[in-house]
UniProtKB/Swiss-Prot annotation:
Belongs to the asfivirus A137R family. It comes from the Viruses. One of its GO terms (cellular component) is host cell cytoplasm. The keyword Cytoplasm does not apply. This is Structural protein A137R. GO terms for biological process: symbiont-mediated suppression of host cytoplasmic pattern recognition receptor signaling pathway via inhibition of TBK1 activity; symbiont-mediated suppression of host interferon-mediated signaling pathway; symbiont-mediated suppression of host toll-like receptor signaling pathway. It is found in: Virion; Host cytoplasm. Keywords: Host cytoplasm, Host-virus interaction, Inhibition of host innate immune response by virus, Inhibition of host TBK1 by virus, Inhibition of host TLR pathway by virus, Late protein, Viral immunoevasion, Virion.
Length: 137
């Protein structure tokens, strides 16, 4: 099987960008629904300075997600599923960032948890999450 790469026209670029915006909105909604919390616990925005799509959580979420043991795995798996990209756990804060290329297409999602990580050795070695690739076009 052969893959043929073609340059996207303006309409295709716009459609792809819209798809990723919708995916982020859907992620936000699913996380809020999954936690069954009446108030919104996360919001997403495009940071024009850093050129990153960010999914930001309120401080209340940092404690709320502990009440749902499956929440961390659910979020990681869902983000991998919708993006097809690598998901990395790191850092002291709980912020999702999505780096974008020049077309606004995400290339990486960093998932930072403010929480107790069970195995810090795995975290430091970067062994927690595997890599997934997708073909876009």
């Amino acid at each position: 099987m052969e893959a043929v790469l073609t340059k996207l026209d303006q309409e295709e670029k716009k459609a792809l960008q819209n798809f990723h915006r919708c995916a982020w909105e859907e992620t936000k909604n699913i996380i809020n629904d999954f936690l069954e919390i009446p108030e919104e616990r996360c919001t997403y925005k495009f940071n024009s300075y850093t050129k990153k799509m960010e999914l930001l959580f309120t401080p209340e979420f940092h404690t709320a997600w502990h009440e749902v043991p499956e929440c961390r795995e659910f979020i990681l798996n869902f983000l991998r599923l919708i993006s097809g990209h690598r998901v990395v756990l790191k850092g002291p804060t709980f912020v999702f960032t999505k780096e974008t290329k020049n077309l606004g297409i995400p290339s990486t999602i960093n998932v930072d948890f403010q929480a107790n990580i069970e195995n810090m050795d795995d975290l430091q070695k970067g062994n927690l999450i595997g890599k997934m690739n997708i073909k876009e076009g």
